[in-house]
């Protein structure tokens, strides 16, 4: 794409050089004179004006002029007054170095620039010097119909304002109304464009119906774009492209663009996008793409766009304290690293609140409030998405899933609240090595959808893990939840649950196994911390039954005791226990009856044998 832009720019230069051949470009560059360029005489010493009759171009080659002073030297066919302080321009104006044009409301309240369809080229104002537009209206105009140009397609020819290559001055546009400018042609024809320069101001304007609102590219720097109202653009509202840097975009309102509101492409650096209102744009409210670095997006109100904020192939950007409501995705990071998403309020997203996707790593997502997302509050997906930290976020009220982990590894979720989401709070697919800690679990549902996923839940101090539904969809023995410490775990429906206890206890209750029958057991894979006193209270047992607790270190015979039918297992060891099994050992009833019957028979036989022996003994005594 970068090469494509360069080729397009070179082609534009070629077109311009042909259009202005033997005119002001060559005059300015080489000091050559051509018959079609006429210098205007009888003007002040510090002002230089020329006219190119082939390209219909008024050339300001020195000094400072305004619209009425230009008109006084040319006939009405080029620049004419059509009403009180209202002017119609039917030519190009070119401002060279060391020259300036002032379009001021004091002398030109309205400037209409005609569209010339005869040679398929619009009229334009092109500056390589200084251009000041203040307190005026500049309108694209069709003098034949006496109305704005009818836009049939993006290529419909309309006038434009351009700060050209190697500009030595500034183009300041303030307190003005600019409308119906620009078209999809060559680089710089899009509406209001800066191809070079630094230190310009674009402040407190209303920009309506341009092909592109404002465009900066090719190392443009130190531009302030503030307090503008940009609407109904056929492309972007504000576009920064190709190594633009040190740009401030502050307190603007951009709405109803056909594409994106604000775009930063190809090595844009040190950009501040703050306090803007971005609404009802068909594309993305803010797009940072292809090595856009050190961009700060702060305190913006972003509402009802196809997407809120997207960062792609860029790093070291900050998204903070934004209000993001009713967008497709609230915030989307794709192949982005080391970005920070902090303290945003994201609500009513039609897809994901925050989507971290496709080889995005080392991002920090903290203290965001995410509510009422239709798909997932936070979605983390695709291989290579790893080592991200999610800290202190609130994810609640989603119509589907709260926190979705899809093919990711080694991410940390710390001190988050994931609650009151309709289907699952945690959804885990083909993901491992992810850690949840210091998080509140209350009526939390966790769904595993494949055999190799696991989730570590640790350091949930003073939190109650109760009433939760940990479900293994495919009923394998590989899915794990690791819990540490002080937890009450209920409804263990997976066969392989990991438990991390500490010096307090873990209460495992409501086990979904029948322990009253022989040869049935419950198995957990676990890791007990080294040199820590561990106390397990295992409930849901049958009073009076005998149980065997087997670990990789010891086998204990335990008798269930207490009114709650619990058994208690205390363990202290310097080595890790990684597995224990609980097995019911009570003898089945039919064996018990058989043994009792045999005992009764044996007793009867013994009784009769003893009785017979006694009689024999008595008879022997009588015979003596």
Q: Model-found features: residue ranges?
A:
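Secretory targeting signatures
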Residues: 1-31, 176, 225, 249, ...
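Beta-strand/loop edge motif enriched in small/polar residues
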Residues: 29-274, 278-326, 332, 340, ...
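Solvent-exposed beta-strand/loop surfaces of large extracellular or lumenal domains
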Residues: 76-79, 553-566
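Predominantly extracellular beta-rich ligand-binding scaffolds that present long acidic/polar faces
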Residues: 382, 405, 412-466
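Catalytic cores of secreted or luminal carbohydrate-active enzymes
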Residues: 456-507
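Short, well-ordered beta-strand segments enriched in hydrophobic/aromatic residues
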Residues: 508, 521-526
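Surface-exposed beta-strand/loop patches in extracellular or lumenal glycoproteins
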Residues: 527-544
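C-terminal beta-strand-rich structural cap/linker in extracellular carbohydrate-active enzymes
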Residues: 562-585
